[in-house]
Amino acid sequence: MKLKVKIAIPGKVVWENEVDEVNIQTTTGKIGILPNHAPIIATVETSVLRMKSDESQNPILMVISDGYLSLEKNSIFIATDRCILEDNINASKLEEDYKTALERYNNAEKPGKKYIANKALKRINACYEILSYRNND
């Protein structure tokens, strides 16, 4: 039995497939989901989404931003404002993006601007986590 996973950003579905396991960071901690898991609704945090499939030795990795997860009858739907597939991570641009986001965070005078810069830093750190994982393979 497999889990049907669908990931959507505003306006479109960015990834859809079947997997054997999903690991995701929620606001209450990391959770692992296997087939026949009890139904849940959870708020997810910006982090690395890891999925495993029997068809591949390597996990499927992507960065997702804050959003929501719904699981019912082995069907997972993740709605997020941003999703970065592993193949779309530009390693050469990450350092520049990190410096820019850190500068914006440090110079932010309003809480809203600090929050947005912090989200960018979390996304960039998650990208680095994926690159680090792949470099250690």
Swiss-Prot record:
A single cellular component GO annotation: proton-transporting ATP synthase complex
Annotated keywords: ATP synthesis, CF(1), Chloroplast, Hydrogen ion transport, Ion transport, Membrane, Plastid, Thylakoid, Transport
Keyword presence, Transport: yes
Recorded superkingdom: Eukaryota
Molecular function via GO: ATP binding; proton-transporting ATP synthase activity, rotational mechanism
InterPro entries: ATP_synth_F1_dsu/esu, ATP_synth_F1_dsu/esu_N, ATPsynth_dsu/esu_N
Quaternary structure, from the entry: F-type ATPases have 2 components, CF(1) - the catalytic core - and CF(0) - the membrane proton channel. CF(1) has five subunits: alpha(3), beta(3), gamma(1), delta(1), epsilon(1). CF(0) has three main subunits: a, b and c.
Protein known as: ATP synthase epsilon chain, chloroplastic
Organism: Bigelowiella natans
